[in-house]
Amino acid sequence: MEKTCSRSVSLAAGFIIMLCYGLLYAWSIYSSPLGEQFGWTSALLGTCFTVILISFCLGGVLGSILTKRLDSRRSVMIGAFMSLVGYGLASTVTAESVWLLFAAFSVSGLACGVVYNATVSTVVMRFPDKKGFASGLLLMGFGASTLVF
């Protein structure tokens, strides 16, 4: 017999996951210090954010495929590992390796899309009677992350 948690626990866990992965939208907070430290222009950093958002969208597609083939737990674990790799790469960026910045945040954006898709689809599926409430609370967590962190 498979052990499952209550739907309210799933909603709370989903909110926390979205709160953590919403840092994607905090780019403007840490792009200025990056530009100052490495001497990069705001146009270059803006292009990097564009790459992040494109990767996020592609990650949503990948997340859909993974969640259908595997389950949501494994999809989130894969996304978490991808985040670890992406932010690990970002920690090694130097002024001369701007390509590494793009690569690192492409992986992080992909990871965010995977986790986003797996989390929203799973939690909303558990709330057939309150889909709007569940998805609204999750998206509130995603948006509130820039405020909290």
Which residues does each predicted region cover?
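Intracellular juxtamembrane helix-capping segments at the cytosolic ends
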Residues: L34, V114-F127, A134-S135
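C-terminal ends and interior cores of transmembrane alpha-helices
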Residues: F81-A95
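Glycine-rich segments within core transmembrane alpha-helices of 12-TM secondary carriers
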Residues: P128-F149
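Pair of pore-lining "gating" transmembrane helices in MFS-fold secondary transporters
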Residues: T4-A26
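Helix-to-loop junctions at the C-terminal end of transmembrane segments
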Residues: G59-S72
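Small-residue-rich segments within alpha-helical transmembrane domains of MFS-like 12-TM solute carriers
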Residues: G22, G109-N117, G143, L147
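Residue-level signature of mid-helix packing/kink "hotspots" within the transmembrane helices
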Residues: Y25, L53-V61, L147
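Hydrophobic core of transmembrane alpha-helices in multi-pass small-molecule transporters
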Residues: V98-V114
